Amino acid sequence: MDETYDLIVIGGGPAGISAARLAAAKGKRTLILEKEGWGGTCTHRGCIPTKALLTCSKSYSDLKKFKRLGIRTGEAAIDFGAVKKHQQQIVRVAALGAEKTLADAGVDIRIGEGEILSASEVRYTDAGGAAQTLKTSHILIAW
C-alpha cells in the first residue's frame, strides 16, 4: 500500500477533524493521527463530559423544585455509578460520531502517535509500539 499522503494531520480534535475533512473534500489524500481518541480534549475531558454531568445535575435540581409546584415525585436520589456510566456513554457516542465523520469523508484514520521527522516525513507509532515512516506533502499540527 502506498503510504504517501497530500496531508497528514496530527491531532484528532475539532480543528484536526475539520482540516482533514476539508482536505479530503478537495480530493487530497489525507491521514489523521490521534493519540487518545477522536474529538480531542473537548470530547474526552472537557465540554462533552462536563455537559453530561450538568444535565444530570440540572435534572436532579428540577426534581427538587417540583414539590413547590405541587408535583410529587417521591424521594430523589443520585446513583453516581449510573451518572458516570451515562457520561461515558455520551463521550463514546461523540467520539464514534467524529470517527464516522472522518471515515465518511474519505480520510484515512489511525490511533497512535505522530512524530515529525522532516518537512515531508512523519513517523507513526501505533499503541503496540510498531512504527512506520509516512511521506507527505503537507503536515498540520492540530493539538
Q: Which role fits each region the language model picked out?
A:
Residues 2-5, 21-28, 33-143:
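Glycine-rich flavin
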Residues 1-15:
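Beta1/beta-strand and adjacent pyrophosphate-binding region of the FAD-binding site
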Residues 18:
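Short alpha-helical segment within the catalytic ATP-binding CA
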